[in-house]
Design a protein with these regions (language model features):
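Subset-of-secretome marker
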Residues: 3, 23-274
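Secretory targeting and sorting signals
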Residues: 1-28
Length: 274
């Protein structure tokens, strides 16, 4: 995969027009060659380093009720930092705001995610909790990780293999939902994506639109569309994210109904932090 090919051709032409020693020309050529995007991403995924993200995402659910076409929209904006483990995202410190045309904007909240645990707070949530506690801890179900997904090297390779370069450093592609998720049971659907790279072939921007359809007439929706627009910056930044002090945390399971209701009203996400 060669990105920025036109720029490299121009560089080579300029070098060849000047008389330089063969060894020097060879060194210049090696230095100019861009790193493969997948290798560039892999090189960043090391403990102690991270990346800053700004993400806008949305879900549009179309369904029919009493022979009337209905639609639900939920939008989420996420800003913060991901910390890497060995080959993946191991922790996150993010500010999240959710909104919908039906309910308006919910109070924003902060979430720290580490492994299967997520810790959520904001001023209203802290006020609703027992004295001395300011964070609610929840645990991801099954073997899921509470940390938000980042594009993995394998996913990046798949997308590049199924994309075409439409401009310098910009790729566009499509795939079936089953192929994109490497899961034949994923159901009917399609995925459209755009990838943007900087001069070092590091991702700066991804846009992914996924459309899914019900498997049969018994499903409660007609169509579901997921849109995710993620911008990356500060690759390789030194990052250290730690869970809140245990003395400040209370498990969601230990909240009584009244306290949980107050926390949700203050912005605690009852369906999960992401």
């Amino acid at each position: 995969m060669k990105l920025f090919f036109a720029g490299l051709v121009a560089t080579a032409a300029a070098v060849s027009a000047v008389a330089v020693p063969a060894q020097a020309a060879s060194v210049a050529s090696v230095q100019a060659a861009p790193v493969d995007p997948v290798k560039a991403l892999k090189a960043q995924l090391v403990p102690g380093r991270g990346v800053k993200i700004t993400e806008s995402s949305g879900i549009i659910l179309d369904f029919t009720a009493d022979d009337r076409a209905m639609q639900i929209r939920v939008n989420t904006r996420t800003v913060g930092t991901l910390a890497f483990g060995k080959g993946n995202a191991a922790a996150a410190d993010l500010r999240v705001r959710m909104s919908s045309p039906q309910k308006g904007s919910n109070p924003p909240y902060r979430v720290i995610a580490e492994g299967r645990n997520a810790y959520v707070t904001n001023a209203g949530i802290a006020k609703a909790l027992p004295s001395g506690r300011s964070w609610i801890q929840s645990k991801a179900s099954g073997h899921r990780n509470a940390v938000p997904d980042i594009v993995t090297p394998a996913e990046l390779k798949f997308m590049l293999d199924n994309a075409s370069e439409v401009a310098t450093g910009e790729y566009q592609g499509t795939a079936t939902l089953a192929d994109f998720q490497h899961d034949r049971s994923a159901g009917e659907g399609s995925v459209e994506f755009r990838l943007y790279f900087d001069e070092h072939n590091l991702l700066t921007h991804t846009v992914v639109d996924t459309t899914t359809y019900p498997d049969d007439d018994t499903m409660a929706y007609d169509q579901m569309v997921f849109h995710t627009d993620t911008k990356y910056s500060g690759w390789g930044t030194k990052v250290k994210i730690a869970a809140p002090a245990a003395s400040k945390v209370i498990s969601e399971k230990k909240l009584n109904a009244k306290t949980l209701k107050a926390a949700i009203k203050a912005g605690y996400p009852e369906s999960g932090p992401f």
